[in-house]
Structure formats: C-alpha cells, structure tokens
C-alpha cells in the first residue's frame, strides 16, 4: 500500500462510520404528525337564541315576624316561556306561597302572573301572563337523548340580578338521580350537572347546545361544589300536558300500601310470620302491607309481604321513592316491578289505572 492509499484509508473509514451512524439515527427517530388543535364552541349564538324565552319571577309573600306581625317578603326565581299565549313553567317551590307573582321578560317589561296548576311532589308549576306582546316559547328536546358527558347550559335569574339571564355551562354528570329535598320532596328522574345553579336560578332552563330545553333547574346539593339538579324535560312535558288538557295531573293508582324497610321493621315482619328473616338488616326495598280490592296490584298477582326492589329496573330504596317513580307514569301505562317473595325474585307487570 503506497502513502496516498495509507493516508486515505482512515478518512474513508471515518466517513463510512459517520454515514452509518447518521442512517441509524434517522431510522430510529420516529416522525409524528402534529395533532390538530381542538377549540370549544362559542355558546353565544345558543344563549342569544334561548334568552328571550327565559323570564325572571319575583314573588311577594306574607309571613309573621317574631312578634306575630304580618310582614311582606319578596323572593326571586326563574321561569321558561313554553307558549306564545303566555304559559310559563317554573318550580313549585318558587311560587308555592306567593301572594303576588311578577314576571319580568327579557326586555324588562313586567306582567302579573297567575297560577294555572301545581305539581308539588315533582316541584313543577304552570303559570300564565296576559300580554299582546310577541313571546318566544322555548323548544323541547327529549331528555332520553341526553348522555352523560353532553354539554349543557343553565340560564336563570341568579340572585335576582337585573338585566339579561345569568348563564353557566357544564356537562351532564349523571341521569335518573333520586333527590330528597330540604322541604321533604322526593324528586325522581333528575339530571345532575356541574353547571352552576345558583339561588334564583330555580325554574330556569337547562338547554343543550342547540338551545332546546332538556331540564328545568331545580335544586343544588348544599355543602357541595358543582352538583346541581334539573327535572328532566320528559317529566316536565308529561305534567304540563296534563295541566293544560285536564286542569290537573292524571295520577296513576296501583292499589298498594307499603312501607320502607329498615332493620327494626324487618325484625318485626319476621316475628309476625313474614318470610323475611334471611334479609340483611341493611337491605333496601318496600314491603307491601295492604292491597286494595279489585286494584291493579290484585290483578297483577302481588301479595302482602312481597318486597318491591325495583321499578322499570330502577332501584327502589324507600316508599316515597317508589311513589315518586309511579307518579312519572300515566293511567293505562304498564310498569315492571321486581319483587322478592320468600327466597325468590319475581318480575311482575302491573297496569296502572286512574286514582
């Protein structure tokens, strides 16, 4: 090997090593496509679309002070226009003690409201204003179409603040919740949301991104952040239609007299001969105590001593909860009950009639 060849050999070797390493590096470094940026939609168009259907409600009540002197007090709530001729839906607890009802529209015009009908056990009320003004009724969407995780918007007269409705947004956190309220109501088929529902928002709409009503804002869980509840739109429509058509709610009848199970009651039933001694003391359900003659319960084959554990596959933990669930149905509807009789679980179909 001559001198030129000797001097070129190290250079050639170095070049090959560098080229080989760079090729390996190129092969080992993965290439990625940047993820497209995702933007949350603006809610401004939806809010602008819904706001004319939202009203503020101010009520005056008479209450006795500590010296038993009558005093006039005021309170605020919200409502939703549901027809062009002035019908408005709100919460029963907003108007239940009202001496006078003032309804403030989106343009700040004020009208006197009158109560058309109340559904206290479901916290729904229907009121009406008389006006020649062109009203914008809200559109409804079936709450059955809602899914956990869907975006929702709550509107209402929060804290009685003047002007346009207060707007908050969040998601559907859960469906078909059962809530015991501070005024001893058992509310069923409730939509749970983390959209803030503040004082004064009660009776306002919970809408989807299309601006359609999916719920009626009702209550919050005291001491908890981000837990509010709205009555499902399907339930609201069911009661509104009854009030408009019949002037009252068509309450179904099953013919059952029952009681919530608790440890002491389970022991008592066991001692008097009911076959319930094997039940855990924390077992939840409703014991059937009596059945009315010639009632839907008789025709379905139910017996005293049967334990109702679910209705339409929804767990039943108290007698009040059971009644509230049955009130969601109408006379003529067929409901499925799961019961325990002895050591056996049975499914029973029951056709409700009119109370």
Report each predicted region and the residues it spans.
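C-terminal recognition in membrane/secretory proteostasis and scaffolding
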Residues: 9-12, 17-31, 45, 114, ...
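N-terminal activation segment of mature serine protease catalytic domains
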Residues: 22-68, 100, 147-148, 241
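Short, small/polar residue-rich loop motifs at catalytic or cofactor-binding pockets
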Residues: 74-76, 98, 198-202, 224, ...
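Gly/Ser-enriched beta-turn/beta-hairpin loop segments
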Residues: 63-73, 116-122, 161-164, 176-191, ...
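Conserved active-site neighborhood of the chymotrypsin/trypsin-like protease fold
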Residues: 34-38, 63, 81-162, 224, ...
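Catalytic nucleophile loop of clan PA
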Residues: 80, 196-216
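Short, flexible surface segments
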Residues: 51, 78, 97, 142, ...
């Amino acid at each position: 090997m001559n001198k030129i060849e000797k001097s070129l050999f190290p250079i050639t070797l170095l070049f090959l090593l560098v080229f080989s390493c760079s090729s390996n590096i190129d092969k080992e470094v993965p290439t990625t496509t940047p993820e497209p940026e995702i933007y949350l939609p603006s809610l401004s168009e939806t809010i602008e679309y819904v706001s004319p259907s939202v009203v503020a409600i101010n009520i005056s009540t008479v209450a006795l002070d500590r010296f038993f002197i009558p005093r006039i007090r005021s309170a605020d709530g919200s409502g939703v226009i549901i027809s062009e001729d002035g019908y408005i839906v709100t919460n029963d607890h907003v108007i239940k003690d009202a001496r006078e009802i003032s309804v403030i529209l989106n343009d700040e015009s004020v009208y006197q409201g009158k109560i058309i009908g109340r559904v206290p056990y479901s916290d729904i009320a229907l009121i009406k204003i008389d006006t020649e003004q062109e009203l914008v009724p809200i559109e409804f969407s079936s709450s059955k179409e809602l899914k956990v995780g869907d975006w929702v918007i709550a509107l209402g007269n929060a804290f009685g603040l003047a002007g346009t409705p207060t707007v908050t947004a969040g998601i559907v956190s859960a469906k078909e919740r059962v809530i015991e309220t501070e005024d001893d109501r058992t509310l069923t088929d409730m939509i749970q949301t983390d959209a803030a529902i503040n004082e004064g928002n009660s009776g306002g709409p919970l809408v989807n991104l299309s601006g359609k009503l999916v719920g009626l804002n009702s209550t919050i869980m005291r001491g908890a952040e981000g837990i509010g509840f709205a009555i499902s739109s399907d339930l609201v429509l069911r009661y509104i239609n009854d009030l408009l058509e019949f002037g009252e709610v068509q309450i179904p009848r099953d013919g059952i007299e029952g009681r919530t199970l608790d440890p002491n009651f389970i022991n008592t039933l066991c001692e008097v001969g009911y076959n319930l001694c094997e039940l855990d003391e924390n077992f939840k359900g409703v014991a059937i105590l009596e059945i009315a003659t010639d009632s839907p319960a008789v025709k379905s084959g139910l017996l005293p001593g049967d334990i109702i554990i679910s209705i339409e596959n929804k767990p039943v933990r108290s007698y009040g909860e059971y009644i509230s669930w049955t009130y969601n149905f109408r006379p003529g509807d067929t409901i499925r009950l799961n019961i325990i009789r002895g050591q056996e679980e049975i499914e029973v179909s029951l056709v409700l009639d009119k109370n």
